[in-house]
UniProtKB/Swiss-Prot annotation:
Changing V63I: In strain: ES694:2. The gene is mdh. One of its GO terms (molecular function) is L-malate dehydrogenase (NAD+) activity. It catalyses: (S)-malate + NAD(+) = oxaloacetate + NADH + H(+). This is Malate dehydrogenase. Belongs to the LDH/MDH superfamily. MDH type 1 family. It comes from Klebsiella pneumoniae. Substrate binds at R72, R78, N110.
Length: 135
């Protein structure tokens, strides 16, 4: 089973430590995170990818976790988060729909109540929506 963690350069690194699989973020430090995690002595292989194209991280993925986006800062309200994070989630889900449409997708990008709905609409438009695989 292959798990892809999208936005692996942020605070999700602790989870990536447990999963040790395919990491992606637009931040150029992501391959370095992968190297750091690869030094942990297990049989699991880990790869890190950065840049605008998440395809290499998504190829063959059975599970995709999206944690990408900006965190809420003091003075921000949920609509501020939505304005930024909705576009990020939309872009990543479009790439998932093309590269690994059969994958289960977990979204923890805030505001979750709207980012999951956006993901559902993107998947429906691509003809690959499965209500049992989006959470």
């Amino acid at each position: 089973m292959k798990v892809a963690v999208l936005x692996a350069a942020g605070g999700i690194q602790a989870l990536a430590l447990l999963l040790k699989t395919s990491l992606y973020d637009i931040a150029p430090v992501t391959p370095g995170v992968a190297v750091d995690l690869s030094h942990i002595p297990t049989d699991v292989k880990i790869k890190g990818f950065s840049g605008e194209d998440a395809t290499p991280a998504l190829e063959g993925a059975d599970v995709v976790l999206i944690s990408a986006g900006v965190a809420r800062k003091p003075g921000m309200d949920r609509s501020d988060l939505f304005n930024v994070n909705a576009g990020i989630v939309k872009n990543l889900v479009q790439q998932i729909a093309k590269t690994c449409p059969q994958a289960c997708i977990g979204i923890i990008t805030n505001p979750v109540n709207t980012t999951v709905a956006i993901a559902a609409e993107v998947l429906k438009k691509a003809g690959v929506y499965d209500k049992n695989k989006l959470f």
